UniProtKB/Swiss-Prot annotation:
GO terms for biological process: regulation of DNA-templated transcription. Residues 1-14 have a biased composition (Polar residues). It is found in: Cytoplasm. Residues 1-22 are annotated as: Disordered. Its main location: cytoplasm. Keywords: Cytoplasm, DNA-binding, Transcription, Transcription regulation. Belongs to the TACO1 family. One of its GO terms (cellular component) is cytosol. The keyword Magnesium does not apply. One of its GO terms (molecular function) is DNA binding. Transmembrane segments: none annotated. It comes from Listeria innocua serovar 6a (strain ATCC BAA-680 / CLIP 11262). This is Probable transcriptional regulatory protein lin1570. Signal peptide: none annotated.
């Protein structure tokens, strides 16, 4: 993964995401609600624990998290969401995976299709691009204020069960197998580290650089997808410079 830092890609769109923080919290609340329907105790519900870690890493207020859990525990309205994944291509052959939580599949399918079609992309069949991605645990630790050197941290992370560590001037990026994610996170947390990002995510096996003439359409497609209330995550194999 060297040279293809997910953190760089995150930072590449960070300003736009910061301006939509309330929408990020709204989507996380839906994800917490769905996970909490399997049980309100994160110690007994790994799915809830994962999404709570994700929410805390982006500074979602504890009150918001608690409200979503309480809503699930007291849900008598029949409110329910289905998990749906869409696959396709952005302009220039960039692979795109869209994960959604929806209470109306027809609405979401229509909105996602429009976002692709209006911006030079095309939706594909199930399996058309998912084989290009691997699911991994992902932890980001900001280096500011840390005294640990690169070799020492890498040894700590590997001993905790990490598969790989990437180092840059600003951050340590830690990658794990999905099943080892919680154990690695807990071990590093107990060692005193805090996380700027803590999540299970999808990573491209091969990256694809966006041609300059496709950049505007690509950006518009990403904005349209991320603005959709039903869309939880958008993954691409675009290399963002």
């Amino acid at each position: 993964m060297a040279g293809h830092s997910k953190w760089n890609n995150i930072q590449g769109r960070k300003n736009a995401q910061d301006s939509k923080r309330s929408k990020v919290f709204q989507k996380l609340a839906r994800e917490i609600f769905v996970a909490a329907k399997k049980g309100p105790d994160p110690n007994l519900n790994p799915s809830l624990r994962l999404v709570m870690d994700k929410a805390k890493a982006v500074n979602m207020p504890n009150d918001n998290i608690k409200r979503a859990i309480d809503k699930a525990a007291g849900n008598t309205s029949g409110e329910n969401y289905d998990e749906v994944t869409y696959e396709g291509y952005a302009p220039g052959g960039i692979a795109v995976l869209v994960h959604a939580l929806t209470d109306n599949k027809n609405r979401t399918s229509t909105n996602v299709r429009v976002a692709f079609n209006k911006n030079g992309g095309s939706l594909g069949e199930t399996g058309s691009v998912s084989y290009m991605f691997d699911r991994k645990g992902y932890l980001v630790i900001l280096r500011e204020g840390l005294t640990v050197d690169e070799e020492e941290f890498m040894l700590e992370a590997i001993e905790a069960g990490a598969d790989d560590v990437e180092v840059s001037d600003d951050v340590f990026e830690v990658f794990t197998e999905p099943g080892a994610f919680s154990d690695v996170k807990d071990a590093l947390q107990q060692a005193g580290y805090t996380f700027a990002t803590a999540e299970l995510s999808m990573f491209p096996t091969v990256y694809n650089e966006i041609a300059e003439n496709n950049q505007t359409q690509f950006d518009k497609m990403m904005e349209a997808l991320e603005d959709d209330d039903d869309v939880q995550e958008v993954y691409t194999n675009a290399e963002i410079n």
